[in-house]
Curated annotation (Swiss-Prot):
PANTHER family: RAD50-INTERACTING PROTEIN 1, RAD50-INTERACTING PROTEIN 1 RINT-1. Belongs to the RINT1 family. During cytokinesis in male meiotic cells, required for completion of cleavage furrow ingression possibly in conjunction with Zw10. Required for maintenance of Golgi stack number and morphology. Essential for acroblast assembly. It comes from Drosophila melanogaster. One of its GO terms (cellular component) is endoplasmic reticulum. Signal peptide: none annotated. This is RINT1-like protein. The gene is Rint1. Residues 163-724 form the RINT1/TIP20 domain. GO terms for biological process: cleavage furrow ingression; endoplasmic reticulum to Golgi vesicle-mediated transport; Golgi organization; Golgi vesicle transport; male meiosis cytokinesis; regulation of ER to Golgi vesicle-mediated transport; retrograde vesicle-mediated transport, Golgi to endoplasmic reticulum.
Length: 724
């Protein structure tokens, strides 16, 4: 191991690597680099030679400059030291004087602070007096500007209260804020009265809404100006104002005064029609007040945004959407109404179910028509309060249970949706389609819920319903009321749809909420339900395949007992035909496969076909080949029956049927091989050769799915090979 290189050596190596590079063909450059650096060293050596006459003057000048700089620095340091001593003596002499005037200086500072304090009090009093003189005048602009000098915001240095924000004078701050709050109330009352008068002249909120399109330009401009003034003036109390509580569980930001005034006539009309003993105030007709809210919003929201949004922008409220705030105020009327009525409505199942439908429809139209944000208060917040949410879920569960019973007790629940389209790969029973529509309807109802926790409760209900539907199918099948094929088609459709839903963004979000932020894998929320359905489907397909194979086996007795050992040689001029003894067996198989293809969905039929083929493959090898002796003619006939009939039959449904019957196909190759080849192969397999040497001749015959022991047993079935 070489010792670690120093920093300088590493720099030299890096420089050489940079100069020569990684290309081995450039190594000849090393000699050039050596000569180059030698010349460079000579030049440096000559430059640094102090005895060289040419360098004497240069070095002499440099040394002289350095000496002069050092002398200058020493001189300045000496001056600083003298000044420090002088300053210390002076401070020591003046210390008694400073101590003598310190108390007076403190008094001066106190007087200065008192002066500033009194000036601020004077400013507040002068502003208050100016507001008092202007409050009854007609100049609102002057009135607002005077108020803004008193308060514009806690962080605004242009107002008195803003300047006091960082000052430790609680009494003065309290006095300034109380003064601002007092005048804010009076000023807001004055502007509100003027604003209401202008709205009245504009015929705002009257039934003749066409008047909005013909409002006087003067009235509109006046309303905009007053709105701007009300947006501009703020109260210190607003900075710490609590959230508005609509219901004990629903809180939101308070509605701005401008929006309150715009809403006032609508609130009055709403209370007139939908409270008390009015005929329009009916518990069974929530759609009446929902429709009224939507109609008012449609009639006015564009006008509100177009007319008053510029006023908010001029007042500095750039992120304030007045149109949506107005809609929020209208929705709040519905929330307040619903909060009062829901307790009584929830006692009646029919009324409660109707309220749920109408509320969900109302929320959907709000979002589609007005772009109502999900973060705003909504009527859904009322019906998702814990006690009502549980009642809603219970109602959904009861309704779905009854609906499932109706679906499965119908006259033909397992009839295919389009029974005539047998070319269709997917066979969908009516009951499966109706059940999935039922689940999808539940999703549509809870899709608009804001909180993931509420949505997860409905997802849990969906999963319970899937399991309940599966159990109902199990009962129907176990009792013999419904055969396996319709059940399989129903399960297959459920699995297909649930897999598709599992990749839907809505259900992926629910999975994320369920699994949490630390989940390592993204799975489907229906994973467990799908696994249970698929497990049962595999069991049903195995039973179906076993039943089909047993029917074929029942017709195979004559074929298995045919004269395979004594079968005469086939005339070479005559073509092979199917063994007469196998006709009935193959006919049963033809009918079974045809019926399965016609009745099962394509993917189920493909899986069942493989299961049937696997069982037939085992049966043909173990019950037929291993229990029978074959003459050469018998082996040829059996090979023909298998490869040209059995394989061809399955070839109608799959591209390479021989892959489904690997062991039977290999047995046919061994039985039909030439006698000499068979003898040599048997001798090799019985010998003491290695496994590789034994499998090599098998690979040459393309016998790949049987081990040497099984191959020996098959070869011993040949009559033309003597047993030793």
């Amino acid at each position: 191991m070489h010792a670690e290189l120093s920093e300088m050596e590493l720099r030299i190596v890096a420089r050489l690597n940079e100069e020569i590079g990684k290309d081995a063909s450039q190594l000849h450059r090393a000699s050039h680099l050596v000569s180059h650096y030698k010349k460079h060293l000579q030049v440096l050596s000559q430059t640094l030679d102090y005895e060289d006459p040419q360098n004497v003057s240069c070095y002499k000048t440099a040394f002289q400059c350095q000496q002069q700089v050092c002398e200058s620095i020493d001189f300045e340091l000496e001056k600083l030291a003298h000044f420090e001593d002088k300053l210390k003596r002076k401070l020591k002499e003046c210390q008694p004087v400073l101590e003598g005037v310190a108390e007076d200086l403190d008094k001066v500072r106190q007087l200065q602070r008192l002066q500033q304090y009194l000036l601020l009090v004077q400013d507040i009093q002068e502003i208050s007096a100016a507001l008092g003189n202007a409050i009854n005048g007609k100049d609102e602009d002057k009135l607002v500007n005077i108020y803004l000098t008193l308060y514009e915001g806690n962080d605004c240095e242009h107002s008195v209260v803003g300047r006091l924000h960082a000052v430790q004078a609680q009494s003065l701050k309290s006095f300034a804020e109380r003064t601002a709050i007092y005048w804010h109330k009076l000023l807001l009352k004055r502007l509100s009265s003027a604003f209401e008068a202008v709205l009245k002249s504009m015929r705002w909120a009257h039934l003749e809404q066409q008047a909005l399109n013909y409002s006087s330009a003067r009235d509109t401009a006046k309303a905009q100006l007053l709105a701007e003034y009300m947006f501009l003036i703020k109260s210190p109390a607003e900075e710490r104002a609590p959230l508005q509580s609509i219901t004990p569980s629903i809180v939101c930001q308070p509605i701005n005064r401008v929006v309150q005034l715009l809403l006032a006539p609508y609130r009055q009309r709403f209370q007139f029609h939908f409270t008390g003993t009015r005929q329009t105030n009916r518990l069974d007709k929530p759609e009446w007040f929902y429709t009224q809210i939507l109609n008012w919003g449609k009639e006015t929201h564009f006008f509100v945004g177009k007319t008053f949004q510029p006023a908010a922008i001029k007042a500095g409220k750039l992120d304030y959407n007045l149109r949506l705030e107005f809609i929020r105020g209208l929705v709040q009327l519905a929330i307040e109404k619903l909060a009062v009525d829901i307790e009584q409505i929830a006692q009646d199942q029919i009324l409660f179910a109707h309220l749920l439908d109408e509320t969900l429809a109302f929320e959907s139209e709000l979002r589609e028509t007005f772009g109502y944000p999900a973060s705003f208060p909504s009527a859904i917040s009322v019906i998702t309060q814990p006690m009502y949410l549980l009642r809603w879920i219970s109602l959904e569960e009861r309704f779905c249970a009854e609906k499932m019973d109706d679906i499965l007790q119908a006259e033909t629940p397992f009839q295919l949706i389009d029974p005539n389209s047998f070319e269709n790969d997917l066979k969908i029973p009516k009951c499966a389609d109706q059940f999935m529509r039922l689940l999808d309807a539940i999703k549509d109802r809870y899709y608009g819920l804001i909180q993931p926790g509420h949505q997860l409760q409905f997802l849990h209900l969906q999963l319970e319903l899937i399991d309940s539907f599966r159990q109902r199918l199990v009962q129907l099948h176990s009792s013999g009321a419904v055969p396996s094929i319709p059940i399989l088609n129903a399960i297959n459709y459920l699995v297909m749809v649930l897999r598709e839903w599992g990749e839907n963004v809505h259900y992926l979000h629910l999975h994320a909420a369920l699994a949490g932020p630390n989940a390592t894998e993204i799975n489907s929320v229906f994973e467990h339900a799908v696994a249970e359905l698929e497990h049962w489907a595999r069991q049903l397909m195995r039973n179906l395949a076993t039943k089909a194979t047993n029917e074929m086996k029942a017709k195979s007795m004559s074929y298995r007992r045919d004269a395979w050992p004594t079968m005469p040689e086939q005339n070479s001029r005559e073509p092979f035909i199917l063994s007469p003894s196998g006709g009935e067996m193959f006919q049963v198989l033809v009918t079974l496969l045809h019926n399965l293809e016609r009745e099962l969905s394509a993917n189920l039929f493909t899986q069942t076909l493989r299961l049937i083929a696997h069982q037939i493959d085992d049966f043909m090898l173990e019950s037929m080949v291993m229990n029978t002796k074959f003459s050469a003619a018998g082996a040829a006939q059996f090979n023909y029956d298998m490869t040209r009939n059995l394989f061809a039959l399955f070839g109608q449904y799959t591209r390479r049927p021989e892959l489904l019957f690997k062991r039977t196909h290999d047995a046919c190759k061994l039985l039909a091989a030439a006698r000499g080849t068979a003898l040599l192969l048997l001798e090799t397999l019985r010998g003491n050769q290695s496994v590789e040497e034994k499998t090599k001749p098998l690979r040459e015959l393309h016998v790949l799915s049987m081990d040497s022991k099984q191959c020996i047993e098959v070869l011993e079935r040949r009559m033309d090979i003597k047993m030793f």
